[in-house]
Amino acid sequence: MSILNVEHLTHGFGDRAIFADVSFRLLKGEHIGLVGANGEGKSTFLNIVTGKLMPDEGKIEWAKNVRVGYLDQHTVLEKGMTIRDVLKSAFSYLFELEERMNAICDSLGEASPEEMDTMMEELGTIQDTLTLHDFYIIDAKVEEVAKALGLLDIGLERDVTDLSGGQRTKVLLAKLLLEKPDILLLDEPTNYLDEEHIAWLKRYLIDYENAFILVSHDIPFLNDVINIIYHMENQELNRYVGDYHHFEEVYAVKKAQLEAAYRRQQQEISELKDFVARNKARVSTRNRAMSRQKKLDKMDVIELAAERPKPEFKFRYGRTPGRYIFETKDLVIGYDEPLSKPLSLSMERGQKIALVGANGIGKTTLLKSILGLIPAISGTCELGENLQIGYFEQEVKGDNRTTCIEEIWQEFPSFTQYEVRSALAKCGLTTKHIESQVRVLSGGEQAKVRLCKLVNRDTNILLLDEPTNHLDVDAKDSLKKALLDYRGSVLLICHEPEFYQDVVHAVWDCSKWTTKQI
C-alpha cells in the first residue's frame, strides 16, 4: 500500500535547480534512507512533502488519515516552556479530547433524554480513545522516553531556551516518539546525540513497525536501520532496494556501465562524423554520408553527469609549539554550577585526543574553558608557548547574510578573488554555492565554509567540537585523512567512533569527571 506518492517533482532556488521531474513512493513498512552529498536537496525534499515548501511543479499525495511526524532541527522551541511542557505537548490532541469530555459532563444535567443519549455515546468514544492512547499514564510515558534519551539528566523542569543544540535535538526527538505518528521523517537525528543514545535510537528504529524516511550521513547507523535507499544526485532521485552497502555496490556497477557505454558511443560518433566529413562532397559516396548523418541526428546521446567537487581538506602546520599544549590544575568547569570534579590534565605536543561522553556533561564547556572563552569556577588552565590555535565550534548562531566569498575574504583580506574561490572549491563547494549567502546553504555546506577558514591558516593545535555533524560521506573521509596527516595536536569532540578511533592516540571519557548523574 502506497503511503506517499510524489510525481514529476521539479524545484529550484533561483537559477540553482534541485530536482528535475523526479518521482518517489513510500510503501507501508518501508524504512527509507535518503542519501546524497551536501546541498543535493534532502532537507528540501522533506520540507516539500510536509507542505512547508511549495514545489515549482509536481504532485505530492499522502494516503488519507496518515499522521506524519517530522524531526526538523530548525524547529524553534517556545520560550518559557520546560522540557516537560514540550514533551507533554505531544499529547495535545488528547488533552483537547479531555476538555471536550469535561464540557460534556458539565452539560449532562441540562440535557434532554435525546441529547443525553448522543452525549453519552460521544463520551464513551472519547473515553475509549483516551484509554487506548494511554492518556492516564502520560507522565509515566514521558519519564520513560526522557530517560531513554538522557533528558532526565538535564532536568525536565529546565527552560528549553537554555538548551544546547544536542539537548534541543533530544527534546524534539523525544516529543516526536511520544506522538507515535504513522510515519516518521527524521532529518539527521544522530547529530549531537552521544553514542549511548544513538544506540538506543538504532534499536528503536530497527523494531519500528511503521514506515520512516531517514536522512543521515552516519553510515553505520543508517545501514543497520533501513531497507530502501533513495539516492539524490544531479537533480535525480533513484530508488535502490537493500541497505547502504548494497546501494554502493549497485551504484558503482551502474556508473561503470554508463561510462563504458558513453566511451563506446563517443567513439562511434567520432567515426560517423569523420565519415560524413570525408564523403558528403563526393557524388559516389554522398548517399552513404547522408545515411550516416541521419543516424547521428537520431542518436540518443548519452550524457555523463558533472562530477561534484570532492573536498580536499589539508591543515597547514605552523611553527613548533612548546612541549605542553596546556596543563590544568584542579580545574572545575561550569557556568552557574560545577560540571566537573577538580581536573588536573595535560596535553603534549603532537598528541591527538578524543573527548567522549554523554551530552550535557561538559565536553564543550571544557574546550571553552581551555581556550579562556568562559571563566573556570575554580582552578587554573595554563596554555603552552607558541600556540597557533584553530577552533571549530559546534554551533554558530546568527543569520549570516554574507556570501561565501565575502566570508572568506573577511578572514583573509590579502587573498585574491581567484584564491578565495579556489580555497572554497577545495572544500567541496560549487560555483553556485560560493556565490550564495551562507544562511541559504545546507548545514553541511556551512560547515565546509567554516572548515575552509580553518585549513587556510597556520595552526599547531586544533580544537574541534563535533566537526562531522552535517558533513556528507566524502567530506568526512577527507577530514579524517586531513587529521591523520596533520602534524599538530588535536583535541576532538565526536560521537562517531568509526571517525575518531583511527585518528587519536587517546580517548578521554568525560563521564568519569562529571559531577552530573548519568
Features from the language model and the residues they span:
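ABC ATP-binding cassette signature C-motif
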Residues: 1-260, 309, 318-518
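Post-kinase regulatory C-tail/linker adjacent to protein kinase catalytic domains
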Residues: 313-315
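Intracellular alpha-helical coupling/juxtamembrane segments of multi-pass membrane proteins
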Residues: 250-305
